[in-house]
Amino acid sequence: MSYELPALPFDYTALAPYITKETLEFHHDKHHAAYVNNYNNAVKDTDLDGQPIEAVIKAIAGDASKAGLFNNAAQAWNHSFYWNSIKPNGGGAPTGALADKIAADFGSFENFVTEFKQAAATQFGSGWAWLVLDNGTLKITKTGNADTPIAHGQTPLLTIDVWEHAYYLDYQNRRPDYISTFVEKLANWDFASANYAAAIA
């Protein structure tokens, strides 16, 4: 059973002008598709074939002999999570239980935004910044290249992709502008809230 490239949860033009159709076509149809294809080819006919991709990632994390499989599995999963972390008319702030938890663990939503932006901006090279639940506490973490919180026992709630292919066509070297736009215009707090609710259920 192969892992299928998920369709975008919005139209290719839905995030413009913040993320353009051209960026989404390259990012989803080329980059993400390549990770999915590489993963399916690498896992085929192994004893992990047919396992959910999350289980494969957790099983092989830290195994240097399976680094290629891990990188493609994690990147396939990370991207699927990222597409749900953004939406048209996103941004703003969460409400309800997640809003209360952010205020409790970060002091305020404004503190969270500052820390999240800093983590995303200071990820050296390619990678990701995440809002995660870790042993009952909300934390911001960043992962390099293909690494993912699910390999470290954390529950991701929201992510931003800071690989250059996520923003370079639209923002060139202005990663901080892309990060600010994500926070203010794109972040899908409904998705993050649903992930939080599931994690504490």
Curated annotation (Swiss-Prot):
Catalysed transformations (reactions): 2 superoxide + 2 H(+) = H2O2 + O2
Annotated Gene3D superfamilies: Fe,Mn superoxide dismutase (SOD) domain (1.10.287.990), Iron/manganese superoxide dismutase, C-terminal domain (3.55.40.20)
UniProt keyword list: Iron, Metal-binding, Oxidoreductase
Positions with a binding annotation for Fe cation: 27, 79, 161, 165
Cofactor note: Binds 1 Fe cation per subunit.
SUPFAM superfamilies from the UniProt entry: Fe,Mn superoxide dismutase (SOD), C-terminal domain (SSF54719), Fe,Mn superoxide dismutase (SOD), N-terminal domain (SSF46609)
EC number: 1.15.1.1
Entry's Gene Ontology molecular function annotations: metal ion binding; superoxide dismutase activity
Pfam families hit by this protein: Sod_Fe_C, Sod_Fe_N
Cofactor entry: Fe cation
Biological function: Destroys superoxide anion radicals which are normally produced within the cells and which are toxic to biological systems.
UniProt family annotation: Belongs to the iron/manganese superoxide dismutase family.
Subunit description: Homodimer.
PANTHER family: SUPEROXIDE DISMUTASE, SUPEROXIDE DISMUTASE [FE] 2, CHLOROPLASTIC
UniProt protein name: Superoxide dismutase [Fe]
Name of the gene: sodB
